[in-house]
Each structure stands twice: as C-alpha cells, then as structure tokens.
Swiss-Prot record:
Protein name as annotated: Queuine tRNA-ribosyltransferase accessory subunit 2
Compartmental location: Cytoplasm; Mitochondrion outer membrane
Cofactor notes: Binds 1 zinc ion per subunit.
Membrane topology designation: Peripheral membrane protein
GO molecular function: protein heterodimerization activity; protein homodimerization activity; tRNA binding; tRNA-guanosine(34) queuine transglycosylase activity; zinc ion binding
InterPro entries xref list: QTRTD1, Queuine_tRNA-ribosyltrfase, TGT-like_sf, tRNA_ribo_trans-like
Length: 415
C-alpha cells in the first residue's frame, strides 16, 4: 500500500492510496469515504442495485459488532468475508463498532474489549479478535482499542492515560499475532489514536502508534457534542501534525457534510458514510447543494425548491415516526410531510441517480406513508449517490483551489 499526495493546501490532502487489495491493483482517491454496510451489505440494497449507484467507494466498511457472532461459519468457509457475501473483488475495512448503533460503555478491561451484536455482548480478547480477523480476511482492520475516553465529555487524565496504555498494549499484541499468522500477512492493521480530550495523552498516543508498523491511523473519539467542536478541532489539528504524511488517516463517527469539511482541513483522509443511512431511516432525502459552479442563491431556491421552507424548521425536531433518534439536519427534507403529497418534482433537480430520473417526491411520500420497502431502497440509492458526489466535489474543489467557496456554500445551507 502506498499513499501518494498530489497536493497539500492548508492541511487539506489530495491524493491517492495505491497498491491496495490482496493483488495490489486497486486505487482509492482521498479525501474520500468508505461504503457503509450492515453485516456486509449496503442497507436496503442488493448487489445489483448497488451497481446502479455512481461513485461507490472502493473500500467497504464491515463492523465487527455485526459479524462477530458468525465468525465460526466464516472460519469454516476459509475464503474470507468478501467471497462469502458475493463481493470477492471489493476491498474491506473492518471496524470494531457500528457508528449508527454504538454499544454501552463500561465493558473494557486491560485484557478485553466488548462489542454488541444481535444477541448481546461479545467479549473480545486479543486472541479471539485476531482469530475473527483470520476468518474475515479483510484488507484493513481497526486494531483492538479502548475507545471509551472521547472528546464528547470531560475525561480525567487518569482515564485518558489508561485508554492510551491499553490501546498500545492491544496494538503490540495484535501486531505480534499478525506476524505469526499466514492468513493475515497481506492485511493491514490500522492503529487507533485515543486519549479523550486530554492533549498530552492524545499526542502520546499519536507518537507511540506512529512508531509501530501500522498501515494507517484511525482517529477515535472525535465524534460527539457539537458544543465542544472547537476543542475537538484543536485536538484533531494537533494530533494529525504528529502523524507521518505517507499513511492514511481515517476518522470514525464523523459523517455530516459540514463536519467532514472541518476534518479535511485538519488532514483527515477517509470518512464513514453512515450519514446517508441515517437520513434514509428518517424518511428523508439529501438535498444540499455542493456545486460551486452554480449561483448559490439560484441553486438553493431552484434546484431543490425547499430552502425557504426548511429555514423555519426547528433543528431539534425529532422524527419519532421513523424510530430513529437522530435529529433532522438542514441538509435534508422530510418526505413524510404532507406538503410533498402532490409534489411531482424529483428529489433534487438535475440529480442523475436512478430515483430522481424515474420517480417524484410525491411517489416517495406515498411509499413512506404505506410503509413500502421500496421507499428505503429508492431513498438509499439517492442518498448514497448524493453523498458520494459530495466527496467528488471536495476533490475537485481541492484541485481547483475552491474549497473555501465549497465550505461557504455548505455553511450557508445550515440552520
């Protein structure tokens, strides 16, 4: 695996990750995102439907929490999770937790980390964790770590230090077992940067992890309360400054467009794409614009036709009918609202996705009101394609030195 930087502007990194995969013949552009999956499948979509989406990321994200209970089957199968789920040509990154449904805290010890599957808690020792990775055979995998000290709340120095010490101990043990494993010789371990909101421990974690032979870095614990955004961003800038430039930086729990841009400005390369799934589960469609070539005022009013109406929404409004506790954002419209009952426009005018070319807001509203499964399929197709297009626009903006304009455009669409 080789990371080639084409351009670095004010901390933003434009480039390619080359020689990926078991054969070393795959390339991924950065900044970019991973394909969010649940038990190895894109939510609501079949493999055939997924192929109809433009710009699908080259790396799919698996979550250990959803697969740990089934690793015996995969171990017996012996061909890895890619072949098992019918995606043998895809690249896979295995993370510990599902960013949409993180488990309860308080189950990390010096010898194990717990993940939460469909049947409850699964305790992971280092040996069990590496045995599961041998069964999955991912291209990349997040190392076992103590991620319970985050920036979302004040962390004591003692707890932050314990988090870093445990994570480094887990990393050394995993690296040793990887050396002894024939199956995992071509897999890459992603080291995890921990330390909560304690600057000293964050920097120690970054420096010590960088000394190990890891293939990249995962910035953990930077998701959380928007009220502490400035603290998180300051920590993030300091941490990325300690990391080598020739290895990719991933971040977990950050997926909203405005937060993505803030992290890119601080040197982050790869993000999770769970935000489109959350939007779909709310019965909503992404409608924010990211085309800097268009007149922003005209784009907001004409392309989507909803900006003036959406300004009046209460940002704290919950969409309880969907069973999703996430708050609605200004980047989406709620198609369950009655006003879309006779709206025969596409979700986004000019969008090239299958849903927008073939269906209307009124039709999606009808599907949602009648609880048709097709609603989730069509919304997921649109939301994924829209989100992947956003990352394409980020790379174009970096090429053309227009990232500041793109950021301004995104910020103008927020409440």
């Amino acid at each position: 695996m080789k990371l080639s930087l084409i351009k670095v502007v004010n901390g933003c990194r434009l480039g390619k990750i080359q020689n990926l995969g078991k054969a070393g013949d795959c390339t991924v552009d950065i900044p970019g995102c991973l394909l969010y999956t649940r038990t190895g499948s894109a939510p609501h979509l079949t493999h055939q439907t997924l192929r109809n989406i433009h710009g699908v990321p080259g790396i799919a994200q698996l979550t250990l929490s959803s697969l740990a209970e089934h690793h015996e089957v995969l171990a017996e199968y012996k061909k890895g999770v890619g072949s098992f789920i019918g995606m043998p040509e895809s690249l896979f990154y295995c993370s510990l937790h599902d960013p949409v449904t993180p488990g309860p805290a308080g189950y990390v010890t010096s010898k194990s980390v717990s993940v939460w599957g469909f049947g409850g808690r699964v305790e992971m020792t280092v040996s069990k964790f590496m045995a599961i990775q041998e069964a999955l055979q991912p291209d990349w995998f997040q190392c076992l770590s103590d991620g319970e000290a985050s920036c979302a709340e004040t962390t004591s120095i003692k707890r932050a230090r314990k988090s870093v010490d445990r994570s480094l101990l887990f990393l050394d043990s995993c690296l040793r077992l990887q050396e002894e494993s024939e199956v995992l010789q071509k897999s890459v371990i992603i080291g995890v940067i921990e330390g909560g909101d304690v600057m000293e421990e964050r920097l120690r974690s970054a420096r010590e992890t960088a000394k190990r032979p890891v293939g990249g870095f995962l910035l953990d614990g930077f998701q959380g309360d928007p009220a502490v955004t400035e603290t998180r961003l300051h920590l993030l800038s300091s941490v990325t400054a300690e990391l080598p430039e020739d290895k990719p930086r991933l971040i977990c729990g950050v997926s909203r467009p405005d937060e993505v841009l803030e992290c890119i400005e601080r040197g982050v390369d790869l993000f999770e794409s769970f935000f489109p799934y959350q939007v779909t589960e709310r019965g909503c469609a992404l409608t924010f614009t990211f085309d800097c070539q268009l007149n922003p005022e005209e784009t907001l009013l004409q392309q989507n036709g909803i900006q003036e109406k959406i300004k009046g929404l209460d940002q704290a409004k919950k969409i309880e009918a969907t069973g999703c506790n996430q708050e609605m954002t200004s980047f989406e419209i709620n198609l369950k609202e009655k006003k879309y009952q006779e709206d025969f426009d596409p979700l986004v005018r000019g969008c090239s996705c299958y849903c927008c070319k073939n269906h209307t807001r009124a039709y999606i509203h009808h599907l949602l009101m009648t609880n048709e499964l097709l609603a989730g399929v069509l919304l997921m197709m649109h939301n994924f394609e829209h989100y992947f297009g956003f990352f394409c626009s980020i790379r174009e903006a970096l090429k053309n030195d227009t990232l500041a304009q793109l950021k301004e455009l995104i910020c103008r669409q927020m409440f």
